[in-house]
């Protein structure tokens, strides 16, 4: 079963920034040499609700894909790259994800293709990932929509977890969010909402050179975020259901 893992690393202050920047370069070779890592991206993050062009220098991420859950858990726990990042960070949260559906590409490939496309159960949490490469001359149109979307994100009490990450500030963006169920996710993402209007405008006006949309089931979490694991109870509910 293919599995994706999102590893988030939070640093206190900016004193670790030179080390982080160096690792954005130095981590690539050992990741390229690890056969169990089928895909990876090293990413920064955004401030505020996460979906902003202003970088958050304290939060960084590794998005990776594996052939099995066992590989995902072993690599993120024991590989030297993850161990180095974890040792330097003040806090680490790793989320393991089972792909349910994925369309589009990221860097020319779709790393999250499931063995079989599936819909999440009506009452289980759903993880949504959207990745877009923005055309430079469309960046203003894209980012002009973001404040209203971020405002709604901050107000939505249904949202369980959220973060915006990206490979290249302004132009390569990833939104990652977790919802209690698919109905609540669709209520935010579609229809006559700021997000729904932005999606329609993106398609009509051709904002992106590349897009990927994926849904996942939350398999498990490791570590903490802001002093706790914000998703542990949801994983426990799934395992005991």
Swiss-Prot record:
Which InterPro entries does its entry note? CrtA-like (IPR049574)
Q: Keywords for this entry?
A: Carotenoid biosynthesis, Heme, Iron, Metal-binding, Monooxygenase, Oxidoreductase
> Which Gene Ontology terms cover its molecular function?
metal ion binding; spheroidene monooxygenase activity
**Job description of the protein:** Involved in the biosynthesis of the carotenoid spheroidene.
Which NCBIfam families does the UniProt entry name for this protein? SpheroidMoxCrtARhod
Q: Which GO terms describe its biological process?
A: carotenoid biosynthetic process
Which domain of life, per UniProt? Answer: Bacteria
Give the pathway annotation: Carotenoid biosynthesis; spheroidene biosynthesis
Q: State the encoding gene.
A: crtA
Concerning its family, UniProt says:
Belongs to the CrtA family.
Q: How is the cofactor bound?
A: Binds 1 heme per subunit.
What is this protein identified as?
Spheroidene monooxygenase
From which organism does this entry originate?
Rhodobacter capsulatus (strain ATCC BAA-309 / NBRC 16581 / SB1003)
Cofactor names: heme
What reactions does this protein catalyze? spheroidene + 4 reduced [2Fe-2S]-[ferredoxin] + 2 O2 + 4 H(+) = spheroiden-2-one + 4 oxidized [2Fe-2S]-[ferredoxin] + 3 H2O; spirilloxanthin + 4 reduced [2Fe-2S]-[ferredoxin] + 2 O2 + 4 H(+) = 2-oxospirilloxanthin + 4 oxidized [2Fe-2S]-[ferredoxin] + 3 H2O; 2-oxospirilloxanthin + 4 reduced [2Fe-2S]-[ferredoxin] + 2 O2 + 4 H(+) = 2,2'-dioxospirilloxanthin + 4 oxidized [2Fe-2S]-[ferredoxin] + 3 H2O; spheroidene + 2 reduced [2Fe-2S]-[ferredoxin] + O2 + 2 H(+) = 2-hydroxyspheroidene + 2 oxidized [2Fe-2S]-[ferredoxin] + H2O
Report the EC code(s) recorded for this entry: 1.14.15.9
